[in-house]
């Protein structure tokens, strides 16, 4: 993913979002073009939200953190790497007995052709529609020959989804179907561009648009870099404002609101963008201030010791509460 720049809420209200480039780390690649946001948070209409009901959702953060450590233990997992295949098998081993779609294809990249494997676990609900929760699981390709293991960037969110899967196993959901997506090849293999990035999720969005699945998706929730012990999820102008408002309401009901949307970032280039472009309500749940000035991002310092089970608890419980709120909102705001 790429962050373009920080903006204060006041500037967001008064200024148009600008096209810029990011040169955070030349060795780890990245420059990107911002997708303009159609509305700012202050323009989001007042939502009619259902009342709070029931105990907080179950989420085992200790187990989720163990998953995180197990993913990291495989080592670097860029596309085409033997460790990458081991992580694929690891994820699938946790989904035995579930309805799993394996979306496998070959990506043509600036560094050659690579196999790409999106894993989709489908949990059926009683309502017509789908809520998608996604995370990428690959690590940065340009850093493939270093000790970079992407503990926060890729492993934290992948572990989060495994624990969410535990909460959904063998349950008939009283609401929308929930699809969990571990998408592949999010990272650029050379330098971040529209063509060299988001390979897996772009393929999945195109496929679902072609087969009609896209029309059934009520919300697309992306988790990325959510394990930082100093957790602060930022508001993203490229995300759907009303959906971010629902996430904030979910966090507030659980007492976690201080960890959400205190700051606003410049538009994020991340796995939600192919769905944003297709009109699907989407939100990027991301903490892109990983160390001072994001110093640990895309470096070998992205390690488990900087992360916390509590952060996984905060995000995991908030995502499950978000699903519960969305299930009871009738109708959802228009796309």
Where are the language model's segments positioned?
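A non-catalytic alpha/beta surface segment that caps or lines the substrate-entry region
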Residues: 66-126
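C-terminal motif of bacterial Sec signal peptides marking the signal peptidase cleavage site
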Residues: 17-21
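Acidic/histidine-rich catalytic neighborhood of metal-dependent amide-processing enzymes
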Residues: 148-250, 264-267, 271-272
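Bacterial N-terminal signal peptides that target proteins for export
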Residues: 1-9
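Post-signal peptide N-terminal segment of mature Sec-exported envelope proteins
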Residues: 29-62
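Acidic/histidine-rich, surface-exposed loop or edge segments in extracytoplasmic proteins
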Residues: 47-53, 64-77, 144, 182, ...
